[in-house]
């Protein structure tokens, strides 16, 4: 694996003609030079989809053998791990039901986080295995695409800093009971400050203490603790319906390579969901209206594919996913074939309807430069398209970027858009749908 500068140097040394320089420049400017994302890259998986989506850096450290070996053998990082293990063992006799004590035992403290940040940078400068980790995984995966313009060292360090923020967010929400971004739908399932819950956390600490002998990487104590907290609260939404490519979206993926895109004015119709506010109701009245709208447009031939976006959102801890319920209705009531339906059963907000829809477009090989259509009830289209409702500002506040570029509002139920590739960036500050 060579950097662009190394390739140029090698070409110059071999006296390759100018056309080779031009070809290399064109190659990099069209692909990896711009953002590094490779649509042919296949994400690696650990035993936990929740970890994979929230902390893909950690999955890579576990699943890429050369990088894992480098990290395991490093004395500095191994020293941090040993310090954490020692605190956990001390916690067995000292923490009792003190939540902060258990958090301090499992999580790297600020000094350790800074030391890890520094050491990862040093390793990236001198170890080929860590350089390859960035160049062959972090960059082409798209999972860290917000940092595409950074150097390899800076990208790796930024990924670590972001992961630390994600761990802390989970600890705050599911151990300390602090209000997160969307507390009404994403909070702990138990009263976090109750003695009962504190006892649960104490038991979890003792349970995980038995696992410490199997941990060989610096991130594992905090990651295991965070994932355990989410499991205790039945917060596995990010993992539900995975692997989608082999399950719910399998038929669509088989169909996509055979689509004649020129026959359709739009690549996809994105359909945001609407969760019912009443328990035991699978599909809300608004959801039913939206299903009929998108079915009508599909049967008119406006697009070959429909993306249904909406997760397990309303009411709190609902057993129904908006996307799967809409899919049932489209197939059973409106005769839409399964091969034309892609589901995103994870989005929890209108912002992430667009973000997740964009991700599916880029990852599933749908032409991203072709216009797409968002179809919904008039109230939501007004909210999306009318500047006075500040939907763009909400995206910038919650995501840090716009996952779409809006074009014409062609009716009260439809607005045109194109996806933005920055949507591929994974967000551990939204752990139920990162």
Regions found by a protein language model. Give the residues of each.
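Bacterial Sec-dependent N-terminal signal peptides
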Residues: 1-34
């Amino acid at each position: 694996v060579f950097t662009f500068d190394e390739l140029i140097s090698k070409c110059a040394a071999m006296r390759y003609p100018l056309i080779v320089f031009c070809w290399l420049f064109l190659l990099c400017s069209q692909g990896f030079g711009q953002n590094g994302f490779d649509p042919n890259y296949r994400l690696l998986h650990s035993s936990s989809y929740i970890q994979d989506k929230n902390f893909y850096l950690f999955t890579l450290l576990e699943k890429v053998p050369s990088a894992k070996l480098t990290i395991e053998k490093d004395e500095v990082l191994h020293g941090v791990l040993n310090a954490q293990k020692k605190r956990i063992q001390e916690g067995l006799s000292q923490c009792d039901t003190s939540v902060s004590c258990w958090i301090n035992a499992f999580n790297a403290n600020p000094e350790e986080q800074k030391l890890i940040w520094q050491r990862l940078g040093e390793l990236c400068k001198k170890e080929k295995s860590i350089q390859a980790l960035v160049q062959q995984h972090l960059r082409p995966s798209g999972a860290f695409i917000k940092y595409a313009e950074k150097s390899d060292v800076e990208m790796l360090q930024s990924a670590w800093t972001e992961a630390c923020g994600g761990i802390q967010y989970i600890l705050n929400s599911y151990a300390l009971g602090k209000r997160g971004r969307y507390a009404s739908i994403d909070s702990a399932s138990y009263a976090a400050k109750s003695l009962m819950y504190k006892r649960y956390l104490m038991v979890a600490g003792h349970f995980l203490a038995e696992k410490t002998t199997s941990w060989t990487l610096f991130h594992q104590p905090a990651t295991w603790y965070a994932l355990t907290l989410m499991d205790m609260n039945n917060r596995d939404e990010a993992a539900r319906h995975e692997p989608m490519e082999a399950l719910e979206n399998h038929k669509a993926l088989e169909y996509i390579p055979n689509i004649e895109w020129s026959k359709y004015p739009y690549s996809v119709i994105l359909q945001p969901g609407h969760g019912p506010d009443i328990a035991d109701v699978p599909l809300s009245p608004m959801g039913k209206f939206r299903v009929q709208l998108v079915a009508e447009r599909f049967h008119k031939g406006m697009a070959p594919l429909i993306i249904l976006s909406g997760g397990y959102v309303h009411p709190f801890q609902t057993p129904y996913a908006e996307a799967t319920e809409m899919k049932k209705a489209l197939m059973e009531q409106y005769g839409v074939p399964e091969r034309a339906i892609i589901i995103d059963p994870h989005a929890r907000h209108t912002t992430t309807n667009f973000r997740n829809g964009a991700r599916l477009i880029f990852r599933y090989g749908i032409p991203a430069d072709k216009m797409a259509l968002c179809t919904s009830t008039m109230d939501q289209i007004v909210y999306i398209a009318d500047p006075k409702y500040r939907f763009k500002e909400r995206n910038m506040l919650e995501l840090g970027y716009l996952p779409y570029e809006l074009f014409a509002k062609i009716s009260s139920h439809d607005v045109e858009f194109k996806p933005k590739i920055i949507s591929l960036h994974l967000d551990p500050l939204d752990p139920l749908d990162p």
